[in-house]
């Protein structure tokens, strides 16, 4: 019998409902309308978004999604649902899934927990490294939803876990397990989702969190620093983003004589378009063309046992007293 004293809301970014241009357009429109993601003045941004970006990018992105789509849906949704089910089984409390953009929405997740009698909600955004573009966007959505309700639940919000020992251990185990099966590379690159440099200059701690995760992982793996570094991927637009850029770094490593390269994406809690297509396909092609021989993407933590154990411990720690 479940303990319904509190419930857990797992939150990730979201995904299109299907790999069609129309579904991609709906999703990108909601995502790129968020001022946390793109903070340009609306009168300037909206014509660019609706007149240029959505019409051009939606068909292109649809083809990319089609290349990674799984039998049960998008990889992000499939792995997120598996995470929810596994965590609920481990905790024996209600666990709901909500996406910042798309479906199931954060509102749907909160409603599910309410229907199960939860008057206390622990929100776990699955972003290890805090950023205003991701973690804060979750908080905004929750506040907007609860603003409409006369009786709101007691809330606790996990801000980050970039340096949590169980998270670092889970990352390290995923690396050593992968190497046990595939052999060790010449070099390990940690690729994080990028944000505009201006956001960091204005106080977003994301790059500090990414550096700290990389440092702790290197210590945990006992990796010589000349064999490991970090970079930022998924850049779009014309302004400067956090550097070094992943694709530029990968090309440079190959040109320096690195023949076998492994890339992991610690900021992504599940594999998705940005890992399975951008890294595993596009960046692999860049590496091989620049003179590399073997390129591997180390899978994200997804629903592996160490990751679910980390989530369980994180929730248990933050729900003390409930």
Curated annotation (Swiss-Prot):
Top-level EC class as recorded in UniProt: lyase
Location in or out of the cell: Cytoplasm
EC code(s) of this entry: 4.98.1.1
Principal subcellular localisation of the protein: cytoplasm
Keyword Metal-binding set for record: yes
A GO MF term: ferrochelatase activity
One annotated GO biological process: heme biosynthetic process
Catalytic activity line of the entry: heme b + 2 H(+) = protoporphyrin IX + Fe(2+)
Residues that coordinate or bind Fe cation: 193, 274
Domain of life: Bacteria
Keywords: Cytoplasm, Heme biosynthesis, Iron, Lyase, Metal-binding, Porphyrin biosynthesis
GO CC, any one term: cytoplasm
CDD domains, alphabetized: Ferrochelatase_C, Ferrochelatase_N
Pathway: Porphyrin-containing compound metabolism; protoheme biosynthesis; protoheme from protoporphyrin-IX: step 1/1
Keyword hit for Iron: yes
NCBIfam families (UniProt xref): hemH
Function: Catalyzes the ferrous insertion into protoporphyrin IX.
Family statement drawn from the similarity comment of this UniProt entry: Belongs to the ferrochelatase family.
HAMAP family: Ferrochelatase (MF_00323)
Protein name in UniProt: Ferrochelatase
